[in-house]
Amino acid sequence: MKRYIIGLTLASALTMGLTSCSDFLEEPIRGQQDMENYFTTEEECEKQITGCYNFIACDDWWQIYKFYNLCNITTDDCWMGNTTQDPGEYRAAAMFTGNTIDLGNAVQNFWQYRYKGITQCNIAIEKIAQLKFNDEKYQKRLIAEAKFLRGFYYFELVKNFGGVPLVMSLKMPSEVQGITLATTAETYAQIEQDFKDALADLPKKAELSANDIGRATSGAAKGMLAKAYLYQGKYAEAEPILQELTCRGSHASGTPEYELMDDFSQVWNIDYNNGKESLFEIQTSDDTQYSLGERYSVLVGSRDDAGWSWGLPTSNLEKAFKDAGDEIRLRYTILHDGQTDVPGDPTWNEENPYVISASKHKSGRCNMKLFIPVNRRPSPYDAPHNPLNIRLLRYAEVLLMYAETENALNHDSEAQWALNKVRQRVQLPEVTATGTALRDAIRTERRLELALEGTRLDDLRRWKMDDGKTMMEHVFGPNGTFVKYNMEESTDPYETTNQQENSNEGINFQAPRDLLFAIPNSEITMSNGTIKQNEGYN
């Protein structure tokens, strides 16, 4: 008889996505326990929820962070960067080749590990509900956490692939074969329902114990639900939730649960993990007994500073900061070759400037948001022990979502308030524009405030321009603004001289193909062809 197996370790996960059949085993494995005898205590239920969280980032760089970086590279904010090694799937993504094989394992790993997380959540939702808890409120909270995380995992999938298979219960291999894609609308409907269900039973951030900091909260669920609405253009549905979070308009009550950090320098500072601006973060630890830290910082760091230099900021992004007069955010977003005053790190000075050498890097810039000061790095630095939490949703983005929503609903005074709240922190003048000009100002603000945080690709794909085309269609392609800038306007000494990475990046972009990633070929094969490839891929 086939039996489902679940591990007993702290961050256990049922390692089975849509393509992982080897975890359905006939016999128990040593150190593991089959599910028929599990979920008999509240402690076992808690461990299962821990397993649900584990798949947010997993335990190394290649499962999730490689894909996150690929998403940045597929925008006007980042080059591939490393010009000394074969970029592999990064080249296929950045050059928009349309070849599903060349996309390699970054996309496949992301797909599979998101479904492994979904599987963990499905198990938790089903099994925890069957156990009698002494504290029914706590039982509901655990189920709510699983629903929040399932909604999060599906949200990450639909943004990148469109409609995906909706797996809402544990599946045997025979049930996976023949599975089909849900529509994008159907996928979003499930995401919305999960976030709605979750927020009803999740605590507020202020109600969390010290040991629970970082777990899902009602505020995180509201923020993610509002974001899901916004990405679909459901502004009327997003508005009341964003009003609750900002305490504005007809849904205002009391004072906001979240605030902006006092200074932009604190937002990605290692000493301000889970700060007052944070709605949801990937939690990390520098405990060397476990792989619970992050290696994203190493992945994007300078090759002259023990990094791998994949995903380097473009001069086009830097120009956007300078055009806006935004010196503060530029300083805490982009680290430059030759810099002698690196924020938070006295290692670098006039005698020992920071190095991002032109021979190894397409750009003389690195991601400052993920920079780890030398005296805070683990040994070895490239081990998964960096304790910088990855900010997934913060209050500044909530304010900008509110600004975008109110502008779309022709409530420009409210949109101005939210936009200027973000600008005040970085000492930029108030925006008084209305209508389309205000819309464009909000879009620029999102690029600057959230630069290198993984939102740019989402925005380029979803924002419509006045001609009805997406912004991504205006940025890329033979006549795209980013392509023309690099081929005709840029005088950047790094980008123009190091042609190991070609400056015509993005010239091959095609819509609608490149508005989504290709579904991994392995998933299509496993489904016996009932899962269909996204349009335009070969």
Model-derived features: positions:
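Conserved, well-structured interaction surfaces
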Residues: 46, 50, 54-62, 84-161, ...
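C-terminal motif of bacterial Sec signal peptides marking the signal peptidase cleavage site
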Residues: 17-20
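An aromatic- and glycine-enriched ligand-binding surface/loop that stacks and positions planar moieties
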Residues: 22-87, 164, 188, 196-199, ...
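Long, intrinsically disordered, low-complexity segments
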Residues: 24, 71, 78-86, 100, ...
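Structural register within alpha-helical repeat arrays
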Residues: 143, 150, 218, 225, ...
